[in-house]
Amino acid sequence: MQNQRIRIRLKAFDYKLIDASTAEIVETAKRTGAQVRGPIPLPTRKERFTVLISPHVNKKARDQYEIRTHKRLIDIVEPTDKTVDALMRLDLAAGVDVQISLG
């Protein structure tokens, strides 16, 4: 796997889960002898929703909600076969979305 790079993008609503997952991925990759760049924090996406509380009148009565999507990027440079096997066997938290691309 010479001159290859594995790029891992992580997304989660809870920053504690995503930080724990990135630490686990980085530790696994370093243990198998690969060079790791990151984790790089990407911009957090904030979605805001405004909902009317009253079912009929009272336009001024509203609730506001916010969902934050935290993102991290990890580059694994020159991965070994051990690195790929270890990453495939890795069990991450259920609330973390993982996208892996080879380049």
Swiss-Prot record:
The UniProt record lists the keyword Cell membrane: no
GO biological process entries: translation
Gene3D superfamilies the record matches: Ribosomal protein S10 domain (3.30.70.600)
Alphabetical list of Pfam families matching this protein: Ribosomal_S10
Gene Ontology molecular function, alphabetical: structural constituent of ribosome; tRNA binding
Organism superkingdom: Bacteria
InterPro entries named in the record: Ribosomal_uS10 (IPR001848), Ribosomal_uS10_CS (IPR018268), Ribosomal_uS10_dom (IPR027486), Ribosomal_uS10_dom_sf (IPR036838)
GO cellular component, one term: ribosome
Alphabetized UniProt keyword annotations: Ribonucleoprotein, Ribosomal protein
Subunit structure: Part of the 30S ribosomal subunit.
Family per record: Belongs to the universal ribosomal protein uS10 family.
Function: Involved in the binding of tRNA to the ribosomes.
Protein name stated in the entry: Small ribosomal subunit protein uS10
Naturally occurring in which organism (per UniProt): Vibrio campbellii (strain ATCC BAA-1116)
This protein's encoding gene: rpsJ
